[in-house]
Amino acid sequence: VVSVSSEELSALAGVGPAKLRKDLSHLGSYGVRGVGYDVTMLAAEITEVLGLARDWPVAIIGMGNLGRALAAYRGFATRGFKVVAVLDHDERLVGLRAAGLVVQAMADLPALVREQGLAIGVIATPPESAQDVADQLVAAGVRSILNFAPVVLSVPGGVDVRKVDLGTELQILAFLAQQRTVPTTRTAEVS
């Protein structure tokens, strides 16, 4: 495919063509009226703007079930993220292997940030450890954190945190499922 129209792209994205054109214009991509968007150029622009033109080195902290599963997840590599380090504070786990990497001690974090250029830290620890891990990541120079622990982290300005709360996501799905099963007589009672 050499080019794609805004109508085709909007159908794939689930948005209207005008919204898609407006959003793409913010990237500096305007397309050609009647021709569409050059697929190769558009993909390159989006990749560059999203910061995916390079591999981002990632460390996963917490080698329990979730941390090991995240370390083994192959989808990161296809999206420009390379897990270069796995760490845990539990000395019984240090030195073991997880997803082909040797589990390192938290004391090694500052050196790993310097040597590996770690850009992103993933917290997969119990909630009571998460804030301490976040503090250590920030002190070592990491400015992007993905937090799987069910707690709100306190970090200084200039540090980006994204929280993944699987329990909340399940609650949202339960709510939506409940809405589909609520009898229609309930709305009649309100009327």
What are these regions (language model features)?
Residues 66:
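Hydrophobic/small residue at the entry helix of a nucleotide-binding pocket
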Residues 63:
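Glycine-rich Rossmann-fold phosphate-binding loop(s) that bind the pyrophosphate
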Residues 57, 83, 119-121:
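Short active-site oxyanion
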Residues 74-78, 137-140:
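Short, solvent-exposed amphipathic alpha-helical segments in soluble enzyme
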Residues 99-191:
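Phosphate-bearing ligand-interacting subdomains
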Residues 77-101:
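NAD(P)-binding Rossmann-fold cofactor-contacting core
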Residues 3, 7, 12-58:
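HTH-adjacent hinge/linker in prokaryotic transcriptional regulators
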